[in-house]
Amino acid sequence: MKQIRFLVLPFFLVLSILFAFTSAPKTKTVVFFGDSITQAGVKPGGYIDVLNQEIAKKGKSSQFNLIGAGIGGNKVPDLQKRLATDVLAKKPDLVFIYIGINDVWHYTHPCCKDKAGGTPIAQYEAGLKDIISQIKESGAKVVLCTPSVIGEKPDGSNAEDAMLEQYAAISRKVARETKVKLCDLRTAFISRLKEQNTENAEQGILTSDRVHLNAAGNRLVAEQMLAYLK
């Protein structure tokens, strides 16, 4: 009887250790790669902060490590330059790419229209494909986001609407051709603005200044991205 007991106890001990290792999910490293919107996303009330709060509500905080990698003024060529150090070095499991606003806005923005300006659309497309290719080669998955808004008038009369639509269309095309998931923020923003911006205001519904997100805008982005955190 004692011999059986000595055999059974180690058996159950091994089983419990194996169960502990197999039942504990791996912590996923998620990097958010972008411009000033993402740079602000890590601050209290920013969309990355909101995502952390939502994950905590579901009791999944230990399953995700969310890292912001946003720098103000960045465009696609800037992301290409810092991809290795700011994203790949983090060994991510998933990367959200939220870019495109400055690639359009800098054609007209006082800061830049007489300097480098925006990003030519062919360069924008090629740059996105290059970034995605390198991330996929590292073994990480990608969610490509469309650029959201430069101005909140839902009737299409914002100065940059036509060009921004072209760049958003390129982002959708790139996601389709590279077979990565698409988070269509522009469509989500326009839909929400058609519901809530009944006075055709230029700002103040989802942004504080036509571009950078207010509390409602950060919540909307977090809502759209949350579905991809599985």
Named regions from a protein language model:
Residues 2, 25, 50-53, 57-65, ...:
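Alpha-helical cap/lid subdomain in secreted, periplasmic
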Residues 66-70:
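Extended hydrophobic secondary-structure segments that form protein cores and membrane-embedded regions
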Residues 6-8, 42, 78:
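Intrinsically disordered and other compositionally biased segments
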Residues 23, 41-44, 59:
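Flexible interhelical turns and helix-capping residues at alpha-helix boundaries
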Residues 3-27:
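Bacterial Sec-dependent signal peptides at the C-terminal "C-region" and cleavage site
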